[in-house]
């Protein structure tokens, strides 16, 4: 900070200009440090090259590190120009001073600058500003929705890597029309599209809680798989081989209710501890088996996969005359 005399008396008035600390050289007459005078009401601060002129009342009004420095409990040194040197970045020091004066201050919009201001507030122990910055950062995190990214599986190895790299439950849809050997029934194309559309809707709704994968290289035509804590929990296969005419046909179904059920069931695997056994049994994850011991039930549960599969190929001789039959495993 500096001031200069102007007008007719400029030649007679002594200059009030103070040399900046950066202009002071060792060995010069102005070089050297001396204690801050105790009767001064004003303080000149050089914070990392940023110059500030404020009052002792502002610096000591709140219980901060600056109050500890300037309350007289410790000796504060100034250079020959009267500047108190503080070895910190001065970028946000003006905001710190404004908060000490007014008790509030507009916060930066940038998350990066907000984090920098939080760091300076912590250094100077300005508790109110620390809390304001932390709250603003938390609100920014809550307002930013996670991206809806759906990886496409290109190999079994990649699938295992994806399953191992996430802590979220996983929903995978395999759809690969090239696996079909027969003609489709009249509703199969429509049902295949419905499965894909439902997958997209679920991904938009639950992408913050579940990882969704697409598989276009598997050996099924349409199949849903549900994973929790790295292992497969349930599987819903939507294809079957039927006799609608005198030849085999591929039928694609759309078990919407079952898909919704398994998607909601897999959410119980969100916690690192895994699902509660009572909740797992209530959702159909436990076996009946009245004669089995509790330990056997728990061991079986670890390796059991709930499946709805339509796999069996029905020959012409096995089919009752004039009827369409679908066998489910």
Swiss-Prot record:
Pathway where it operates: Protein modification; protein ubiquitination
GO MF term list: small GTPase binding
Annotated region (Disordered), positions in chain: 1-21, 280-302
Segment forming the signal sequence: none
SMART domains the record matches: BTB
UniProtKB keywords: Nucleus, Ubl conjugation pathway
GO cellular component terms attached to this protein's record: Cul3-RING ubiquitin ligase complex; nucleus
Subcellular location: Nucleus
Primary subcellular site in the record, as a coarse category: nucleus
Domain (BTB) ranges: 41-109
Self-association state and partner proteins as the record states: Homotetramer; forms a two-fold symmetric tetramer in solution. Interacts with CUL3; interaction is direct and forms a 5:5 heterodecamer. Component of the BCR(KCTD13) E3 ubiquitin ligase complex, at least composed of CUL3, KCTD13/BACURD1 and RBX1. Interacts with RHOA; with a preference for RhoA-GDP. Interacts with POLD2 and PCNA. Interacts with SPRTN.
BP term (GO), one: cell migration
Gene3D superfamilies assigned to the protein according to its UniProt record, in alphabetical order: Potassium Channel Kv1.1, Chain A
Similarity comment text for this entry: Belongs to the BACURD family.
Compositionally biased region (Low complexity): 1-15
Keyword Nucleus listed: yes
Described purpose of this protein according to its UniProt entry: Substrate-specific adapter of a BCR (BTB-CUL3-RBX1) E3 ubiquitin-protein ligase complex required for synaptic transmission. The BCR(KCTD13) E3 ubiquitin ligase complex mediates the ubiquitination of RHOA, leading to its degradation by the proteasome, thereby regulating the actin cytoskeleton and promoting synaptic transmission.
UniProt xrefs under PANTHER family: BTB/POZ DOMAIN-CONTAINING ADAPTER FOR CUL3-MEDIATED RHOA DEGRADATION PROTEIN FAMILY MEMBER, BTB_POZ DOMAIN-CONTAINING ADAPTER FOR CUL3-MEDIATED RHOA DEGRADATION PROTEIN 1
Protein name, per record: BTB/POZ domain-containing adapter for CUL3-mediated RhoA degradation protein 1
């Amino acid at each position: 900070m500096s001031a200069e005399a102007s007008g007719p008396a400029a030649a007679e008035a002594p200059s009030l200009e103070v040399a900046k600390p950066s202009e002071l050289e060792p060995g010069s007459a102005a070089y050297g440090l001396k204690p801050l005078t105790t009767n001064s009401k004003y303080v000149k601060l050089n914070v990392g090259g940023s110059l500030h002129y404020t009052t002792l009342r502002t610096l000591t009004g709140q219980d901060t590190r600056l109050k500890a420095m300037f309350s007289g409990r410790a000796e504060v040194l100034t250079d020959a120009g009267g500047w108190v040197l503080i070895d910190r970045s001065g970028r946000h020091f003006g905001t710190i001073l404004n908060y000490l004066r007014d008790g509030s201050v507009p916060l930066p919009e940038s998350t990066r600058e907000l984090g920098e201001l939080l760091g300076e507030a912590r250094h100077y122990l300005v508790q109110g500003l620390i809390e304001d910055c932390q709250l603003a950062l938390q609100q920014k995190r809550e307002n930013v929705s996670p991206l809806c990214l759906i990886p496409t599986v290109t190999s079994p190895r990649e699938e295992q890597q994806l399953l191992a790299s996430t802590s979220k439950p996983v929903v995978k849809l395999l759809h690969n029309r090239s696996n079909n050997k027969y003609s489709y029934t009249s509703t199969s194309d429509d049902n295949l599209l419905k499965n894909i559309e439902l997958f997209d809707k679920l991904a938009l709704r639950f992408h913050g809680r579940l990882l969704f994968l697409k598989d276009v290289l598997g050996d099924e035509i349409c199949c849903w798989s549900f994973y929790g804590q790295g292992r497969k929990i349930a599987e819903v296969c939507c294809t079957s081989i039927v006799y609608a005419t005198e030849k085999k046909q591929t039928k694609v179904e759309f078990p919407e209710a079952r898909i919704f059920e398994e998607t909601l069931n897999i959410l119980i695997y969100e916690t690192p501890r895994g699902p509660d056994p009572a909740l797992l049994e209530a959702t159909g994850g436990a076996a009946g088996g009245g004669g089995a011991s509790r330990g056997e039930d728990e061991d079986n549960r670890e390796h059991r996969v709930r499946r709805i599969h339509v796999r069996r190929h029905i020959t012409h001789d096995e089919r009752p005359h004039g009827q369409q039959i679908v066998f489910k495993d």
